[in-house]
Amino acid sequence: MSGLHILAFGAHADDVEIGMAGTIAKYTKQGYEVGICDLTEADLSSNGTIELRKEEAKVAARIMGVKTRLNLAMPDRGLYMKEEYIREIVKVIRTYKPKLVFAPYYEDRHPDHANCAKLVEEAIFSAGIRKYMPELSPHRVESFYNYMINGFHKPNFCIDISEYLSIKVEALEAYESQFSTGSDGVKTPLTEGYVETVIAREKMFGKEVGVLYAEGFMSKKPVLLHADLLGGCK
């Protein structure tokens, strides 16, 4: 296959939506191919079931315009630095050949989110080594960025999602089992105004960069701008 433009990894289905659903919708609307890879089935989540979460993930993907979504069924709360996990992620990277890869930001209250970022970073490096898993052709990712799930960290750069906030909210609301208690659910940090908190964060980031809403991202490397700083104005 020719490869994805963007491949976003998350520890659980809904992680990617929380961090960058607006950005994904923005790029799929422009015709770019975007994929999502969830590492676990979130089987330890307080609400919902594995089967329901997978159905919700399919709905959210469709809302964002994502045609490729995978789940590696790694153990929830067991995302440790293991060679077998790195190899599985390398297979995904080499199969789908993304230009850009995203994963959660390392500083997050949930250990699975931080460990997901570390595993993906290791896999990106290994995916470019020719003699590592030689049965698959090597692939070098052009850039690796981190999106935010929990917290209000100061981003290295932002992407304007003002026109796509409604899609982000719709994608999040697809996870009804996670963001509302329902008749048989229990209260968690996700059910107590979490979506509203995410919206407030994107509004804050937007205010800092002069737009209505924006998603913030982190990068360990300097970011090269591909647009005129003056927007073509003279």
From Swiss-Prot:
Name the encoding gene, please: bshB1
Kindly state a single biological-process term from the GO annotations of this entry.
bacillithiol biosynthetic process
- What are the EC numbers? 3.5.1.-
Physiological role: Involved in bacillithiol (BSH) biosynthesis. Catalyzes the second step of the pathway, the deacetylation of N-acetylglucosaminylmalate (GlcNAc-Mal) to glucosamine malate (GlcN-Mal).
- Binding-site residues for Zn(2+), renumbered to this chain: H12, D15, H113
* Cofactor(s) in the UniProt record: Zn(2+)
Protein name, as recorded: N-acetyl-alpha-D-glucosaminyl L-malate deacetylase 1
Q: Which UniProt keywords apply?
A: Hydrolase, Metal-binding, Zinc
Q: Which reaction does it catalyse?
A: (S)-malyl N-acetyl-alpha-D-glucosaminide + H2O = (S)-malyl alpha-D-glucosaminide + acetate
Q: Has keyword Metal-binding?
A: yes
- Record-level Gene Ontology MF annotations: deacetylase activity; hydrolase activity, acting on carbon-nitrogen (but not peptide) bonds, in linear amides; metal ion binding
